[in-house]
Amino acid sequence: MAKLLAMILAGGEGRRLDPLTRDRAKPAVPFGGRYRIVDFVLSNMANSGILKMKVVVQYKSESLNTHVQRAWRLTSLLNQYVELVPAQMRVGPKWFEGSADAIYQNLNIITDEEPDFTFVFGADHVYRMDARQMLAFHQDRKADLTVAAVPIPVGEASEFGIIEVDAEGRMVGFVEKPTSDPKTMPGDPTRCLASMGNYLFTTEALVQEIVRDAGDPASAHDFGKSIVASMYQRKRVYVYDFARNVVPGQTERERGYWRDVGSIDAYFQANMDLVAVDPVFSLYNDEWPIFTVQYNYPPAKFVFNNERDNRIGRATDSLISEGCIISGAHVHHSILSPKVRVNSYATVEESIVFENVNIGRHCRIRRAIIDKHVDIPAHTTIGFDHEKDRKHFHVTESGIVIIPKGMRIEAGR
């Protein structure tokens, strides 16, 4: 049986997710009520039977470190682990200068473990994937590198590495985030084939390429720009079509679902994907569960049923986490993390509320993301007047209001 190792790159700053990333790394941003974004890639690896994982961290990693340490305890008796790897400056007093450099500075981990194949996956996407199927594809083609890819609309090409393949699935072209005239898919001028940022290397080839790149002073030391763009011209580089990946318990509708949640709008929409009656991505797949930390919080509670003055505690088309209290309020098409209290006569619509938030009486909140430890005074209105909201909060062009972690909101705002 082949020896496998997963290197999970979780060190990105996540600037486009500001202010949600002011105090945490992007993979540590809460998602779906009770998860962190990093849980999806780690769950995919665990469900695939790949149980040796190194999580490479760097920027604002305290929240991420705490979460991984509490949630991801595999058994050392069977040499299974999920271990954090901070920037160690093994090659000099410098931070990681790119995703490829993050691997170069930690090559000792790979050479010590001596895996036959090494997965290098990002930690900031939402999806389900059986990585063993990608491994079988890689082995069948005797590839040096296999890149997982997904079709995207041509208008989004500037955000991704765009791939060109031949009839056998071998990479024959690659441009990182093209600014014009992206290569479209054969027979479909409306879509491009985009790299998912998930790579599978034959380990010998990975070490050779990482060392070669580290010795190039002109390199950006980035997997897309530097490794893939160079390697496909010299080595056996193939492209794995993510749409072919079949996960147990997955509906046909969910197949191929993959979201880059690197911007506020994309993050918001991916969360909203979860709350539909028939969601395009379901958290309720017992055959391929998403694992996370388990806290000893009490069940969610819904109180008051006074129809006369509309003081009814209820939630519709929503995800309500443990420890929440909906006290005579209405929550609709929203996601609440643990220990959120929504008080009487308040309404919360199409919003994402992080842990330990208190929403006062008679508040009206719509299309908002509220970070942790925020107390919203009674009668506060958010999301109905964007000009007014912009004076106090961050508002995206699409009208999503973001309230930063721990923000103090004055009564009567």
Swiss-Prot record:
It is an enzyme of class 2 (transferase). Pfam families: Hexapep_GlmU (PF24894), NTP_transferase (PF00483). Keywords: ATP-binding, Carbohydrate metabolism, Glycogen biosynthesis, Glycogen metabolism, Nucleotide-binding, Nucleotidyltransferase, Transferase. One of its GO terms (biological process) is glycogen biosynthetic process. Its EC number is 2.7.7.27. PANTHER family: GLUCOSE-1-PHOSPHATE ADENYLYLTRANSFERASE, GLUCOSE-1-PHOSPHATE ADENYLYLTRANSFERASE-RELATED. This is Glucose-1-phosphate adenylyltransferase. It comes from Anaeromyxobacter dehalogenans (strain 2CP-C). The gene is glgC.
